[in-house]
Amino acid sequence: MIGRIRGILIEKQAPEVLVDVSGVGYELQMPLTSFYELPELGQEAVIYTHFVVREDAQLLYGFVSKQERSLFRLLIKANGVGPKLGLTILSGMTAGEFVACVERDDIATLVKLPGVGKKTAERLLVEMRDKLKSLMEASVGSEREFMLQSNYKASEVVNTAEEDAIAALLSLGYKPAQASKAVSSVYTDGMSSETLIKSALKSML
């Protein structure tokens, strides 16, 4: 099982990245909360991974922290939550924010995420409450540290920033009209794709 990789980041197209490890390119799908934490292209990245083998594919999911990976593993064990929905949840909120939702029984916030209806949100709150006991203190305690360490540097802005942002939101399950409206409402000149995606997601929660 592949638990961690370290290599040069050679491609970034949210939510997917390509990392060169000794000449071998590893494709990973990452929640946007982790994607934002990645270094610039050409720099070394350390990514914790979760490997999934299916009949038709072998998929590698990446996370910048063990904490986020642990939460992802708990999420996909919940009834009705697969890897895709797990990524969507962790793209819409940090691990600490999800833990806070569970603590507060905050269904209203969860149902704003694509693919999470009222029944799914209620089931998540019930199932995750017990499973999160081992992660609760670490998640909440480190939330401030993660926020302070986050450094969303604007990369070189290209004409496709809006297109990239819309594509990323569509890949998470948002409808075209939702994605386009959210991106248009927050876009300002000079925004990078990553900053635009982050702002658009926040506007929908």
Curated annotation (Swiss-Prot):
Transmembrane segments: none
Main location: cytoplasm
Keyword annotations of the record: Cytoplasm, DNA damage, DNA recombination, DNA repair, DNA-binding
Any one GO MF annotation of this record: ATP binding
Family designation: Belongs to the RuvA family.
NCBIfam families reported in the protein's UniProt record: ruvA
Name of this chain's protein: Holliday junction branch migration complex subunit RuvA
